Swiss-Prot record:
Location of this chain's protein in the cell: Endosome, Multivesicular body membrane; Prevacuolar compartment membrane
Gene3D superfamilies linked: alpha/beta hydrolase
Protein name according to UniProt: Putative lipase atg15
Gene (name only): atg15
Enzymatic reactions: a triacylglycerol + H2O = a diacylglycerol + a fatty acid + H(+)
Subunit structure: Binds to both phosphatidylinositol (PI) and phosphatidylinositol 3,5-bisphosphate (PIP2).
EC number: 3.1.1.3
Length: 595
């Protein structure tokens, strides 16, 4: 038996060739690739790739990260709507920093790392955050006029690594990312077109149009920060993105696109109907145009997350860039830290962003666990929502900044009380804020949600889809008239008037008007049909009988009869006559004009 076992073992190895042993190794690449993460809905041929849900190992919830600038994305909007380019930062790339005033500095090499730490953060967000699914929700909200109603199973409560907003170093590092606005020195950077539909060979000034995002990543690519460029500082239309930023500001943060307020405000839509009345459907249509910053931010986010599918994404921004970052954070459920951001609850409600069960989508400022934190100070009128008065610099610059409510939590430095500062727009610039507020305080302020805040309380908004039927019923009026008449000839005159019968007539009429509009217009109904029914109550006529008096005198005197005898006869009782009047119905007008 022992020999048999030894023979069989020897025979097995003896008949095996080397190629037979190596063939499983040739299958390893295929087996390994088969276990690569696969994302549903990926479109390799499309330039706009959906953001992915990482399927790999989760990064630690608390850690320290050293971020460096990796890419600059530029998404065209107005002038070049098909433009989407990317600049990869290499050791040979030379950049110029652009200051708050739009002045270019000397050549810099942005290789100094920015250190920030993370901590566990709970966010309630959609379970399926693919771009295609998000687009379906937005389309539904656009067509129905309200955010799509989702079941509780469509939402998850996730704990993920978020920025440590209680640490001063982290807050300052994120603010530095929003302050860093770079352009490349010609010849030192190679912009890559994400798709080939834009011919930039003869284009000049394309960097002055669109939305720009700076992408920072840590050493392990486990955490990525996207910083969006905010509003240009110039107050009057000029070069760069100033005009486009003003259009987006007035479209997103005004009650009605710069209408209904100061004549200095730049009007960016025509949706107001009457005083403090506006067509909300018209406003939302303008906000969702493809050349708006929110639409451009969706494309930026989707392409960046395609490059880093397993990374944890943070968003940050200043002013308009902070507001757009917050809208992105609410859309995809990622952490957001903004600085001096414009109050963005108003556009969040109008865009129809999905809201968890138990929250009213019309008031996104009431949501909890959004993962968004808005840092600012009380001397900044933009952040506080007060830069809209007649004498404010925003108004004189054409900006209609009427929104007042933030989503998420506000982290407010009370510089008016602590430092005695006066409110002014000069204190809105990010470099001033970093030097005098973020670095000037020893600790960061506590963060808390904004309570009892409402936007555009004087306004009334209505939605239209071309099929409304508006019915208006007028008030009912009742009139009573009393008419006293006499016979044309008095047959029995008396000392104090005629003794003939007196007729009293009372008439009561009720008028009801009902107007039905099948095709409403901007300034009234185009084809109302008005029906007036006049119904009169029965006429009541009372006839009083005449009084008959007979006098007989037997012994007349100087001043009258000395022995008069008076006999008084009263006619039968009064006669009551009731007359039923006809009911009159009148229909007028089928096609009224605009007014």
């Amino acid at each position: 038996m022992k020999g048999l076992r030894g023979h069989n073992k020897k025979s097995f190895w003896g008949n095996t060739r080397l190629s037979d042993l190596l063939w499983p190794v040739t299958l390893l690449p295929g087996l390994i690739s088969a276990y690569q993460p696969v994302y549903l809905g990926s479109r390799q041929s499309s330039p706009f790739l959906p953001p992915q849900i990482p399927l790999g190992d989760s990064p630690p919830l608390s850690d320290t990260h050293e971020f460096t600038l990796r890419h600059i994305f530029h998404r065209g909007t107005y002038q070049d709507p098909d433009l989407h380019r990317r600049l990869d930062i290499t050791p040979d790339t030379r950049l110029r920093a652009v200051s708050d005033a739009g002045i270019e500095s000397d050549v810099v090499t942005p290789n100094t790392p920015l250190v920030a730490s993370s901590q566990p953060l709970i966010i309630e967000r959609l379970a399926d955050r693919r771009l295609s699914v998000i687009e379906e929700h937005l389309v539904t909200a656009r067509s129905s006029g309200s955010a799509v109603a989702l079941s509780p199973s469509d939402w998850v409560m996730d704990t993920l690594p978020g920025p440590n907003v209680t640490e001063k170093k982290t807050v300052v590092a994120l603010a530095m990312m929003t302050a860093n606005d770079y352009i490349e020195v010609p010849g030192t950077g190679d912009w890559q077109d994400i798709h080939g539909r834009f011919n930039h060979s003869g284009s000049f000034g394309w960097q002055g149009d669109g939305l720009r995002g700076h992408v920072y990543a840590d050493k392990t690519n486990s955490t990525v920060v996207i910083s969006l460029k905010g509003t240009s500082p110039a107050l009057f239309d000029g070069e760069g993105t100033t005009t486009n930023d003003k259009i987006n500001d007035n479209l997103f943060f005004s009650c009605c696109c710069g209408q209904g307020g100061s004549y200095l405000w730049r009007q960016v839509c025509d949706c107001q109907t009457t005083l403090y009345n506006a067509n909300l459907t018209c406003i939302v249509e303008a906000m969702l145009d493809e050349n708006r910053y929110y639409r451009a931010s969706l494309d930026l986010y989707s392409n960046i997350t395609e490059m880093y599918p397993n990374a944890n994404v943070w968003l940050t921004g200043h002013s308009l860039g902070g507001a757009v970052s917050s809208l992105l954070g609410l859309t995809f459920g990622v952490p957001v830290v903004t600085f001096e951001a414009v109050p963005e609850a108003l556009p969040a409600a109008r865009l129809g962003l999905p809201s968890p069960p138990g929250h009213d989508s019309r008031y996104p400022q009431s949501r909890r666990n959004t993962g968004s934190y808005h840092f600012g100070h009380t001397a900044d009128p933009v952040y506080m929502g007060t830069c809209n008065g007649v004498s404010s610099v925003c108004t004189w610059g054409g900006y209609a900044m009427e929104s007042a409510c933030h989503t998420g939590q506000m982290c407010v430095y009370d510089t008016v009380e602590d430092k005695g500062w006066r409110v002014g727009l000069s204190k809105h610039r990010i470099n001033y804020v970093i030097a005098n507020v973020l670095a000037g305080y020893d600790d960061v302020p506590p963060c808390a949600p904004e309570e009892e805040c409402y936007d555009c309380e004087l306004w009334k908004f209505f939605r239209s889809n071309g099929s409304e039927i508006t019915t208006t019923t007028s008030a009912t009026s009742t009139s009573t008239s009393t008419t006293t008449s006499r016979t044309s000839t008095c047959k029995t005159p008396g000392w104090w008037g005629c003794l003939d019968q007196t007729t009293t007539t009372e008439t009561t009429s009720t008028s009801t008007s009902t107007s039905t509009c099948k095709t409403p217009g901007w300034f009234g109904c185009k084809d109302p049909t008005t029906t007036s029914d006049i119904t009169s109550v029965p006429t009541i006529t009372t006839t009083e009988p005449p009084m008959t008096s007979t006098t007989t005198c037997k012994t007349p005197g100087w001043f009258g009869c000395k022995d008069e005898t008076t006999t008084q006869v009263i006619a039968p009782a009064a006669t009551l006559t009731i007359t039923e009047p006809p009911v009159t119905s009148t229909t007028t007008g089928k096609h009224l004009g605009r007014f």
